[in-house]
Amino acid sequence: MSQRGNRKTQVGIVVSDKMDKTVVVQVSHLVKHPVYNKYIKRSVKYKAHDEENSCKSGDRVQIVETRPLSKDKRWRVRQIIDRFE
């Protein structure tokens, strides 16, 4: 039996929860500019599967890589770290 490899995880903020069982999570990170040595904030948006529709906009969540669930969804919500108040 082969074991499943380590899956990638990301932490981000839910920016949209308008779809059924799907949330859009924005993951931000800092990148150093090669010439000016200044750190620039870059962000990527991922569509993630939320089975119970428990995530709301503004929540901080951890997402984990999974098999393709649809055309755009390749991530699944593992846990809600902080609720937005």
Curated annotation (Swiss-Prot):
Gene3D superfamilies: Nucleic acid-binding proteins. Pfam families: Ribosomal_S17. GO terms for molecular function: rRNA binding; structural constituent of ribosome. It comes from the Bacteria. CDD domains: Ribosomal_uS17. One of its GO terms (cellular component) is cytosolic small ribosomal subunit. InterPro entries: NA-bd_OB-fold (IPR012340), Ribosomal_uS17 (IPR000266), Ribosomal_uS17_bact/chlr (IPR019984), Ribosomal_uS17_CS (IPR019979). Keywords: Ribonucleoprotein, Ribosomal protein, RNA-binding, rRNA-binding. Transmembrane segments: none annotated. One of its GO terms (biological process) is translation. The keyword Nucleotide-binding does not apply. Belongs to the universal ribosomal protein uS17 family. Part of the 30S ribosomal subunit. One of the primary rRNA binding proteins, it binds specifically to the 5'-end of 16S ribosomal RNA. This is Small ribosomal subunit protein uS17.
